Amino acid sequence: MQLDDDLEFAKKIFNPNRAFAKQARIKNMCEYKDLVHEANENYENFWGELAKQKLTWFKPFDKVLNSDNAPFFKWFENGKINVSYNCIDRHLKDKKNKVAIIFEGEMGDYNAITYRKLHSEVNKTANLLKNEFNIKKGDRVIIYMPMIAESVYMMLACTRIGAIHSIVFAGFSPEALRDRINDAQAKLVITADGTFRKGKPYMLKPALDKALANNTCPSVEKTLIVIRNAKEIDYVRGRDFVYNEMVNYQSDKCEPEMMDSEDPLFLLYTSGSTGKPKGVQHSSAGYLLWAQMTMEWVFDIRDNDNFWCTADIGWITGHTYVVYGPLACGATTLILEGTMSYPDYGRWWRMIEEYRVDKFYTSPTAIRMLHAKGENEPSKYNLDSLKVLGTVGEPINPTAWKWFYEKIGNSQCSIVDTWWQTETGGHIISPLPGATPIRASCATLPLPGIHAEVLNEDGSKTKPGEQGFLCITKPWPSMIRNIWGDEKRYIDSYFSQIQLNGEYVYLSGDGAIVDENGYITIIGRTDDIVNVSGHRIGTAEVESAISKHEMVVECAVVGIPDTIKGEGLFAFVVLCDGAKCNLGESLELLKEMNHILAVEIGKIAKLDNVMYVPGLPKTRSGKIMRRILKSIVKKEPITQDLSTLEDVNVVKEIINIAQMEE
């Protein structure tokens, strides 16, 4: 399918809105370049001054950056801080009656939570975790929750007492939930009875019951359940407790735990190319500093702004730009339960009109869906409150960018096409809305203090227009600190492939092109990760799940372009000897494999197409050559070296099958 379907438009340059630029924090490219120069001249002083100015410390740090044990970098060493204090308490002096969170439920219910109310609810929740569940500093708490205000209370309550939270996306299966509970060795799991989705109750507690069945998660002592949709659920005596009944008996005073700068703030599991999810570990001070700075620079957040990021808290975007970033700035953040399509495709635009949203941040998949399903819906609403639009999670194609720019932003709003990852904690490459001339589908320039470069495998810089590996060549405060419990995997995944001046640099796994102006365009993954609707899915875990089907001998999964999701999943499947597959059986097999994927991973992992083949192209060492399969799917000529293949004829047979199926 053709994604970049308006290439002429993609060549146009759009300058920032002049009226907006005049009052922006960074008003022009000269100011941007001054900040870049300042960071380059004295890197540690640049970050140290930002940390002193922007964060509230219980005890000042005495060293900005410690690289002695690289790549296990330490930032703001020996400083003492608490993230919940920085997100709530420090705002109470002059913002206690300001709305911190606007929540809108799927069924039309609404709640505005002030900073004073947030302080009270978080403290009561923190006391509940301490007093009734014996949660202490360093304990891991799994949060398997929908998009409701209580989810934020749980996150901030953990940070207040020094517990490490790990949020599992509420769409993940019991098996995926179990894997994450066990890897984190979580002591407590917090969930809801359910939520509302498309106007109907959607249950979560039964999935937790399955995950914990037969004592398969021995570290879990108790579970805490928030009653949301009030549907009947099963309770296990002595294990399951109801939040709503217990929290009101707790004091609303809870002193924040004094945390070291480098104490883990949270774990967030992301897909790994080897199949087992990786527990990305983030620190307290460095992560929060960059969450706040990117809110100020990239979104130019203002005191009277209503900020809406549509991401789920189960993803890093929800962590940084629904919760920690906006609240660190003392801003107002919106939380929406349910889907964009209920009761109709005008829901999001209606919310922007009703709440006078100033800054709006969403995914290209959502934009493409809204464009395809409700192209004329935006014209029914007043969207003139919008000042900055943002995209996240995947590259955005020019047609979607154009519609977003013209129809949602009325050709007046800068679009900040942000590139970053779970591992980076916050934005790495992005336009600045008051300064950067923008181009459709281009992430533009690294932010001040960030050294992002496009390199060849030998560490040399690519020439303009050449594709290379996107790397970050200097440490930054919000970077991943480790993979939970697996230092070797941390090094192997990020710091083992490309060297610059004899030192391994951070390898993002994304391919990119830099132009003669230094603008960076993201091409997509270079490893075995597929980006479906902005969600990273490892092909290894998909293949592992499919292989559980009794008729499947082996399989290989690759990403394919999709006009709505960005990428879809295409499987090459080898069936058992003698197994035949007519059209009807093929469709039934596809249905069965997708059922397995829904159970093993979740409904976000769904095969869009399958091809039944006699074998897979493998090297003599047994490695599947997925690049060849990608070329076949895209109908591109096979340019890869086939001399290392065990059986070259397999490629010819697959090409013949592909041509027959056209």
From Swiss-Prot:
CoA binds at R197, K198, G199, K200, T317, S533. Acetylated. Deacetylation by the SIR2-homolog deacetylase activates the enzyme. The lineage of its organism: Bacteria, Pseudomonadati, Campylobacterota, Epsilonproteobacteria, Campylobacterales. Its cofactor is Mg(2+). The gene is acsA. PROSITE patterns: AMP_BINDING (PS00455). This is Acetyl-coenzyme A synthetase. InterPro entries: Ac_CoA_lig (IPR011904), ACAS_N (IPR032387), AMP-bd_C (IPR025110), AMP-bd_C_sf (IPR045851), AMP-binding_CS (IPR020845), AMP-dep_synth/lig_dom (IPR000873), ANL_N_sf (IPR042099). PANTHER family: ACETYL-COENZYME A SYNTHETASE, ACETYL-COENZYME A SYNTHETASE 1.
